[in-house]
């Protein structure tokens, strides 16, 4: 697909009638708002995040962190230990977690869905290096990763302007109406699972995004990141997820993101916060917690093993990173045996 020629997302306005917005969300599986979030607040967060990334060696020394000029020698992605080290330093920022609780999103979603909504504890940042396109987030439905209930919603927002060449999200409108999880297969990229493009329609939508623009979509809406084709700029974005209080939340969403890749817990996250207000905020509620469904991850692993046997270099790379991260894990032991390491 040519990302420069994709049709644009339909723009909604926060002031539109809630019945109309809810009908649109039910029909299209998404809502796109211009400048829903405060751009100045996002740019302040951007400086904090990118300053840490520069201190971690990801950005060119001496450049303005706001410009996000990547050092290609530091290139890494989710699944690499060197990525997790810097990522978790960013993850500790109080402002990064606070923005998920902003009234602009919480109040709007509450009005649209007709009930009080909660941001899930596990917040996610996506920090993508330029021209590392093999690791672009593939086509998927969020439910395979975040689970709990179909009736959850992702709020995606770039931290700064994100033109199409920088790799914003693209989605297939109405794809959530299948009302089920589609088949997912092994892939590189965040989550390591992908829907085959031929299993979907070809009506992909995307946009140039400005700071403050926000895309909200259903857990079954098929979407992907477009590749970061910029010459030298990092793509930085937020993935926050919301649900009503009365539906299940999956156990993994109560832990910090990528804590399965490193020794990292909420006490690490909160160590330098200046306020206690949002610490463990979800524990005041009687939440129904569901066990993580391992099915899709197991399918992806088995496919990666089979592909590696057939000489697939991407699958081999995936298994090598797994063994490096967690050499004693059950799947890693099997992978190491196959790899001969």
Language-model regions: role of each:
Residues 4, 11, 164-224:
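Double-stranded beta-helix
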Residues 146-164, 216, 241-244:
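Short, conserved beta-strand element in jelly-roll/cupin
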Residues 37-39, 126-127, 144, 162-164, ...:
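Short, solvent-exposed loop/turn segments at secondary-structure junctions
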Residues 3-10, 59, 221-321, 333-337:
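Non-heme Fe(II)/2-oxoglutarate
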Residues 2-28, 34-139, 145-146:
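Non-heme Fe(II)-dependent double-stranded beta-helix
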């Amino acid at each position: 697909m040519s990302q420069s020629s994709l049709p644009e997302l339909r723009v909604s306005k926060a002031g539109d009638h809630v019945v109309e917005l809810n009908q649109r969300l039910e029909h299209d599986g998404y809502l796109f708002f211009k400048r829903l979030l405060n751009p100045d607040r996002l740019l302040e967060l951007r400086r904090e995040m990118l300053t840490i990334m520069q201190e971690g060696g990801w950005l060119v020394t001496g450049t303005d962190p706001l410009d996000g000029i990547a050092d290609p020698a530091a290139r890494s992605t989710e699944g690499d230990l060197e990525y997790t080290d810097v990522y978790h330093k960013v993850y500790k920022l109080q402002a990064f977690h606070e923005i998920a609780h902003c009234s602009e999103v919480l109040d709007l979603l509450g009005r649209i869905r007709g009930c009080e909504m909660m941001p899930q504890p596990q917040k996610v940042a996506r920090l993508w290096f330029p021209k590392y396109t093999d690791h672009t987030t593939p086509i998927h439905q969020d439910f395979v990763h975040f689970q709990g209930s179909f009736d959850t919603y992702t709020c995606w927002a770039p931290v700064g302007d994100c033109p199409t060449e920088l790799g914003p999200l693209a989605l297939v409108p109405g794809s959530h109406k299948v009302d089920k999880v589609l088949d997912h297969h092994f892939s590189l990229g965040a989550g390591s699972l992908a829907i085959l493009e031929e299993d979907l329609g070809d009506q992909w939508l995307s946009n140039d995004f400005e700071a403050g623009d926000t895309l909200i979509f259903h857990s079954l809406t098929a979407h992907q990141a477009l590749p970061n084709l910029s010459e030298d700029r990092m793509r930085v974005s937020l993935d926050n997820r919301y649900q009503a209080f009365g539906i299940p939340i999956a156990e993994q969403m109560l832990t910090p993101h990528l804590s399965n890749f490193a020794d990292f817990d909420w006490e690490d996250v909160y160590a330098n916060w200046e306020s206690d207000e949002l610490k463990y905020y979800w524990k005041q509620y009687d939440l129904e917690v569901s066990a993580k469904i391992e099915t899709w991850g197991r399918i992806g692993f088995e496919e990666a093993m089979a592909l590696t046997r057939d000489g697939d270099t991407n699958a081999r790379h995936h298994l090598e990173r797994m063994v490096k991260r967690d050499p004693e894990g059950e799947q890693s032991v099997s992978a190491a045996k196959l790899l001969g390491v």
